Amino acid sequence: MNDERLVAINFEQQIFSKISEISESVGRAIRYCKEDGKVEGCETASHVDFLNHIHLLLGNYNNDLASSIEKKKSELIVRNSEGLPVMDIHEEVDKDGNIISASVAPQRISSVIDYADVFRSLPGFKNIENGGNRDTSSRIEELSEEEINDSTKNINYKAPEMGSLPSNTEFTSTPTLGVSEFPSKHGDHSDSKTYESPISNSQAASLSDSDMVQQIKNGSKTSLFKKGFLFKKNNAMQNRTTSNIKSNASAIEKNKETILNALNNSTLNENGHQDTQNEVLRDIVLEHPTAKAQDTGESNKDNNTSTSKHKKRPKRLSKFKQAKLETKKSGNKDHATSSEKLSLGNESIHSINETRSSSIEEPDNADNKIVEEEPMLLPVPTTAQGQNVLEAVQYDGLDSLEDMEALIQEMEEEGELDDNSESEEDEHGMTIGFSKELKAPPDPQYFTEKTGATTYVNGNDESLNVSDFPQIVEQEELSSKNPRKVHFSDTLEIKHVSRSGKANIEVIPAPTEEYDNLFGPDDFQSRISAFRKARSKLRAKENEEGNHSNATCTIKNDDLSNTLNNRAANTKLNPKEEDKSTVESELKAPPKEKSSETSKEYLNEPSVVKDFVVERTPSDKISESKEAFDAKVEEISDQRAISQRYYELRKKMIDNTGEYIKDEEEQAVIPLDENGNEKPKMSRFMTARLRGRVPIYEH
């Protein structure tokens, strides 16, 4: 069985009853507006339309609730202890006992009462020892005191709401959404009201007296709600005043009287004896301790310490936490005593203790009243007139325009405002002559850090004061008639800020005509080290002589050409390498001499260049013509391509035998892995390390 679904059904039934009450009250309001109000054209009035709309919505919602309740009831199937559904067999029999028709259907729960009856009638819930339900009187006699106390705790005065009162009364709380419809465990019936339920017994479900007593005998709980479903254990114990506690105790006494009167007026059995069910209820009501409601005036700590066996023990504090709490308590006591001494002034300690003991009222143990101490007032600094210092502070803030105008008038009267300071303003609100108002600070150390330097005057340590220094700034410069000269920079930095927040600073230089003759030609030259300057001077001297340097250069170049020719004859080179060797020989050949006039024609060589180093130019004489020079430049213009081809050919020579490994473009078969993937390429460092062990792929 699913208890939560049953609880949901019961809760929806109670909401159904509340909504029906609200709809009735709205209907009465509509009738009053139409009949008793006597307003002409009241049917078209806005408030009547509003009430009609609410009435219609409530009716629709109530119908939906009723249909959902019936649907949920029909879905609840009775199951046995093994989880199998209990089947109902309906047969129609004639007078002779012949079966006319039969139908088998799973047994469903029609209401909460049927659920309780069916659940008790299942075979798994009978007493196995005697083979059936035992007698109630013998069961009650065998109950121990602990079991009776447990049953009273489980009941918690649910008897009035579950139907032990006369049938025309029920306990409900105020119709607030989200609040439980049942009174609290500790007898908080002050807000409860009695009314006649407008719903018939078929729509609203409630337990009868016999079902409740039967559940008490069997030791089961009368409340359908689970533990902690709607309210917590100590919910009613928190934040209660003495007046609420007394009203709760009186409400409990009234409920007890009504229950006992109902039990005394009940009917007798067939044997003439009073029913044992009423005796059980009377014993439970009389044995329930009423002092609990009265003793709730104590603090929550006292209630927690005087708990029953079922409540948890308080956690054991560590030594560190105990010491911390003790220091806090002692600190609070010291603060209280010191503040009292300050506030009481000239009184002695003995009088302080007397006034403190007299001001605190000890709680009466008989009435268990909570005495609320008045908050302690700490001493506050006061003025000579006895007014609080914090309240007597007057702020100089300007609260209105009138205060500002009054302040400006006072400053004009005292001469603080100068007539010259009121200058014209531009479109941005800035004063045009603001630079004239700038004055130098009188303190010479205004912009410097103050050091702790000390001087010893007459053996005494005295710090230097600013007033001891003479004022450096003259009064003529301080006057507004002779302002300081301002030096403007040669460039203007204009900062443009876009909407995205990026700032672009544009540096606008001054016109260059004024600065053309300021810098000499030496300032634009590159910085050359002293070693290169010395070397260039030596080379210039050798070129002028033209004896020793040319001879050495020709010898070296001849040696290089001979070595290159010998290597080309010994090794067979590709045609590409032959082209490369010819280019190198042409590059390394000694330049032919030519007159200096032709060089000046197409190179525009200035006279200043002679004093500076030009790399790889041993002399300023060029031996070739202009056309030959241009052709050579075109041939060797793409030196990067030549060097790249050189290193490609160099990579191929990885074996001493002179055999070449073809590139991927030249190779028809690409070596593959076992899985069919291309093998990774080896770097040139790996190939150089492996050398002869590199496999050569043949195809």
From Swiss-Prot:
UniProt keyword list: Cytoplasm
A single Gene Ontology CC term: cytosol
Bias kind Basic and acidic residues: ranges: 183-194, 323-338, 574-603
Comp. bias (Basic residues): 308-322
Keyword Cytoplasm: yes
Biological process, per Gene Ontology: formation of translation preinitiation complex; RNA polymerase I assembly; RNA polymerase II core complex assembly; RNA polymerase III assembly
InterPro entries assigned to the protein according to its UniProt record, in alphabetical order: DUF3835
Subcellular location per the Swiss-Prot or TrEMBL entry: Cytoplasm
One Pfam family of this chain: DUF3835
Chain spans, region Disordered: 175-208, 289-364, 539-603
Compositionally biased spans, kind Polar residues: 195-208, 339-360, 548-573
Tagged with keyword Cytoplasm: yes
Protein name: Uncharacterized protein C736.07c
